[in-house]
Amino acid sequence: MAENWRSRIITEGIQRTPNRAMLRAVGFGDEDFNKPIVGVASAHSTITPCNMGIAALASRAEAGIRAAGGMPQLFGTITVSDGISMGTEGMKYSLVSRDVIADSIETVCNAQSMDGVLAIGGCDKNMPGAMIAMARMNIPAIFVYGGTIKPGHWQGQDLTVVSAFEAVGQFSAGKMDEATLHAIEHHACPGAGSCGGMFTANTMSSAFEAMGMSLMYSSTMTAEDAEKADSTELAGKVLVEAIRKNIRPRDIITRKSIENAISVIMAVGGSTNAVLHFLAIAHSAEVPLTIDDFETIRQRVPVLCDLKPSGKYVTADLHRAGGIPQVMKMLLNAGLLHGDCLTITGETIAERLRHVPDTPDPNQDVIRPFDQPLYATGHLAILKGNLASEGAVAKISGVKNPQITGPARVFDSEEDCLDAILAGKINPGDVIVIRYEGPVGGPGMREMLAPTSAIIGAGLGDSVGLITDGRFSGGTYGMVVGHVAPEAAVGGTIALVQEGDSITIDAHRRLLQLNVSEEELAARRAKWQPPAPRYTRGVLAKYAKLVSSSSLGAVTDRFV
């Protein structure tokens, strides 16, 4: 296959004289028209520390592509900052941005007949957005993570942005003074890079490394270290070789490689958002995957890494301890990883791991020995019951009380709930319900980091449950259950909950139950009316019309 297998349609022949004329204006010479044209999709932005270092990485990617004999073409895609928009109306655009990113990369690459694409992302939705596009297009592709932020430091503590969210709850509960709150604000985010714990961005980048779509060790590098830039240049070279070898995303993104990714997510204690995003990636790659598959994998894979939000360490510590390859090698040796899966380098997972030690360095405790795991089984549990017949997702690591039955405290928006928590109106034993925040109802399925952090900060993390048809940040922990489906806006049972109803959350039995008779629920359902759309124009209105259930990945192109 010719290296310029797609771009030749715009570079060859007399009829393409005008096309070549425009390409000459952006730097092409006579010798370049037979080279593969490789897109560099850059999510550089100064609205968030997650993405503010990506421009320099994009330049290194271009250099790598050129050195390997390709012609890079740089273009931009968007990002939003989940951390900055958290707790506001703006957070409704976060999950929407995943699909905008996917659509934008697909649009540019296909419009310009690119032979391959290297995407660089930082904030949470950059990763799944780029991978969805790659899986859809199935042209040679590689993902480069912009890198994790280094931890902040204050009074001997490692800080992350979640420290600041939790400090708000502590301050509101009278457990922290304003000077301490201000100090944490100043020290939590010391520079460039994505939020530092095993939150959503680091979870997804780690999963892509495990899946074979990113270079090994690249997902845990810090954004500001030289090795991140060097790895990015190498990724450009590897992609050009993948074009020559005709290695496509769907050769790599298979059922087995997705199982590998999910296994690593469980082992590192990753974000609940990974469930939503991998359902969407599998849909784009036409790989059969259901929400129940996560539960199957959870039951066989232990949590091996002691990482924030519920653990001790940050992702930079994981890198020093051996990174994702060390975790993968342990899973491979235990028969929990498919070693025959292809990677973007052309080697298999087993081949790439052949030089990785069988056991972690005994002089660190970020990665536990396989026979001494943090938890014997995975932490992302799929709960079902009359409140979530299609399923819901709970992160059960660090939960001291895995079962709670209590009175429902019902809120139809995140803001109303947060106000109640900060005003001291939530009591131990309560089960908070935040509804009409799902993919359709929000729309956009906001993350509930502000309420959950306020609960933790108020000292209620072990005594209060929270369920929602919205999402949770990767920084959330506690007795919280999200992605409840069907959601309230489409008539799910969560819409029928009334203040004071008894609700049971049982992580051991994987049960989410409204303790109300079927007769009473039928009577309530007969009276229920769907709410009017919150938006009738613009991207949120379009999204609400197109988006599927969270149990199907909240995708916007499921038409059959």
Curated annotation (Swiss-Prot):
Keywords: 2Fe-2S, Amino-acid biosynthesis, Branched-chain amino acid biosynthesis, Iron, Iron-sulfur, Lyase, Magnesium, Metal-binding
Textual note on the cofactor: Binds 1 [2Fe-2S] cluster per subunit. This cluster acts as a Lewis acid cofactor.
Positions bearing N6-carboxylysine: K125
Known EC number: 4.2.1.9
Cofactor(s) named in the record: [2Fe-2S] cluster; Mg(2+)
Entries under InterPro entries matching the protein: DHAD_IlvD/Edd (IPR050165), Dihydro-acid_dehy_C (IPR042096), DihydroxyA_deHydtase (IPR004404), DiOHA_6PGluconate_deHydtase_CS (IPR020558), ILV_EDD_C (IPR056740), ILV_EDD_N (IPR000581), IlvD/EDD_N (IPR037237)
Pathway: Amino-acid biosynthesis; L-isoleucine biosynthesis; L-isoleucine from 2-oxobutanoate: step 3/4; Amino-acid biosynthesis; L-valine biosynthesis; L-valine from pyruvate: step 3/4
Entry annotation: catalytic residues: S473 (proton acceptor)
GO BP annotation list: isoleucine biosynthetic process; L-valine biosynthetic process
Job description of the protein: Functions in the biosynthesis of branched-chain amino acids. Catalyzes the dehydration of (2R,3R)-2,3-dihydroxy-3-methylpentanoate (2,3-dihydroxy-3-methylvalerate) into 2-oxo-3-methylpentanoate (2-oxo-3-methylvalerate) and of (2R)-2,3-dihydroxy-3-methylbutanoate (2,3-dihydroxyisovalerate) into 2-oxo-3-methylbutanoate (2-oxoisovalerate), the penultimate precursor to L-isoleucine and L-valine, respectively.
Subunit structure, as described in the record: Homodimer.
Xref: PANTHER family: DIHYDROXY-ACID DEHYDRATASE DAD (PTHR21000), DIHYDROXY-ACID DEHYDRATASE, MITOCHONDRIAL (PTHR21000:SF5)
NCBIfam families referenced in this protein's UniProt entry, alphabetically: ilvD, PRK00911.1
The name this protein goes by in its record: Dihydroxy-acid dehydratase
Natural source organism: Thermosynechococcus vestitus (strain NIES-2133 / IAM M-273 / BP-1)
